[in-house]
Curated annotation (Swiss-Prot):
Natural source organism: Pongo abelii
InterPro entries named in the record: Sec62
Amino acid composition bias (Gly residues), ranges on this chain: 325-335
Keyword entries, A-Z: Endoplasmic reticulum, Membrane, Phosphoprotein, Protein transport, Translocation, Transmembrane, Transmembrane helix, Transport
Name of protein: Translocation protein SEC62
One Pfam family here: Sec62
Length: 399
């Protein structure tokens, strides 16, 4: 009895909240980020004090109107106002308490760990026997492993392990004061949102209209009848599609011996939106034996090796042809150099012939040099004959 009297006295001292306080509390309730958890066996919503202060500083009450001062100017003013709301029981302060594991749970986990360790040892012994059998196949798989590594680099990385969040529960705090920080406050004020009010009103009107269906005009009743028939046909078509896609999958699976998995409209029965349930149109997966894949890869590698060998043979033939042409050029150049090493003009011709051989005009320059060599040789023979003719004349004159 004494506690009830004290509670009534507190309510009388605090008084009822004003319209402004209700408006601020309603704005804070629907705009401040909240989270839900369990407290004393009930589901409650809670918020953090610092986020509530930031929310009110961004509200319309933090801006000054004409002839009036702003309600919230600093963080301290917001804290004082929130203390008023706390006293009027819009929310109350709570304390976070981390959930501790009981001894029974710890024992169960230990027993599970022992059982799992025994299973792991059995698995390890089996794996060792399997590894001995697979040593022969490792050499063949090295080449395939390099290809798989290249594919893995292209694919996105493996998803990281989810961090386990620590579980906690809320308990009422002894000191009911609003403090700016990471303190937790649980909502008591729970007004009806405008959207929920509108949705409920529409639902009530729809129920009343459905009960008055016999009083509707004939045209409206016929229209509703056709709409209901169309909706029923649409639902029936979706059900038929779901059955047909399963039948198609089974037919293809049986014909191909389980190698080809073809799904028409794979997301039709998935938990997605209406439009996404029709995307993609189909999916196809090949789940055949690995031997076929290895044969295909070996055939591809052989084809690549053959093509590489053919290219190498073609390149070697070209180099041999160039090598045959090269020595002939050098030989002709050597003869020309020995015959005409004394004259500057012959040296210039040799340089030109070397430059032309680099440009790929070897055969043309060879013919020109041969002609020039022949003409030079004829000129030298004529000069030698003239010199021989002059020597006897000079001997006669001396005599």
């Amino acid at each position: 009895m004494a506690e009830r009297r004290r509670h009534k006295k507190r309510i009388q001292e605090v008084g009822e909240p004003s319209k402004e306080e209700k408006a601020v509390a309603k704005y804070l309730r629907f705009n401040c980020p909240t989270k839900s958890t369990n407290m004393m066996g009930h589901r409650v919503d809670y918020f953090i004090a610092s986020k509530a202060v930031d929310c009110l500083l961004d509200s319309k009450w933090a801006k000054a109107k004409k002839g009036e001062e702003a309600l919230f100017t600093t963080r301290e003013s917001v804290v004082d106002y929130c203390n008023r709301l706390l006293k009027k029981q819009f929310f109350h302060r709570a304390l976070k308490v981390m959930k501790m594991k009981y001894d029974k749970d710890i024992k169960k986990e230990k027993d599970k760990g022992k059982a799992e360790s025994g299973k792991e040892e059995d698995k390890k012994s089996k794996k060792e026997n399997i590894k001995d059998e697979k040593t022969k196949k490792e050499k063949e798989k090295k080449k395939d492993g390099e290809k798989e590594d290249s594919k893995k680099e292209e694919t996105p990385g493996t998803p990281k392990k989810k961090e386990t969040k620590k579980k906690f529960k809320l308990e009422p705090h002894d000191d009911q004061v609003f403090l700016d920080g990471n303190e937790v406050y649980v909502w008591i004020y729970d007004p009806v949102h405008f959207k929920t009010f509108v949705m409920g009103l529409i639902l009530v009107i729809a129920v009343i209209a459905a009960t008055l269906f016999p009083l509707w005009p004939a045209e409206m009743r016929v229209g509703v009848y056709y709409l209901s028939v169309g909706a029923g046909c649409f639902v029936a078509s979706i059900l038929l599609l779901a059955v047909a896609r399963c039948i198609l999958f089974l037919i293809i699976w049986l014909i191909t011996g389980g190698r080809h998995h073809f799904w028409f409209l794979p997301n039709l029965t998935a938990d997605v939106g209406f439009i996404d349930s029709f995307r993609p149109l189909y999916t196809h997966e090949y789940k055949g034996p690995k031997a076929d894949l290895k044969k295909d890869e070996k055939s591809e590698t052989k084809k690549q090796q053959k093509s590489d060998s053919e290219e190498k043979s073609d390149s070697e033939k070209k180099e041999d042809e160039e090598g045959k042409v090269g020595p002939g050029n050098h030989g002709t150049e050597g003869l020309g150099g020995e015959r005409h090493s004394d004259t500057d003009s012959d040296r210039r011709e040799d340089d030109r012939s070397q430059h032309s051989s680099g440009n790929g005009n070897d055969f043309e320059m060879i013919t020109k040099e041969e002609l020039e060599q022949q003409t030079d040789g004829d000129c030298e023979e004529e000069e030698e004959e003239e010199n021989d003719g002059e020597t006897p004349k000079s001997s006669h004159e001396k005599s």
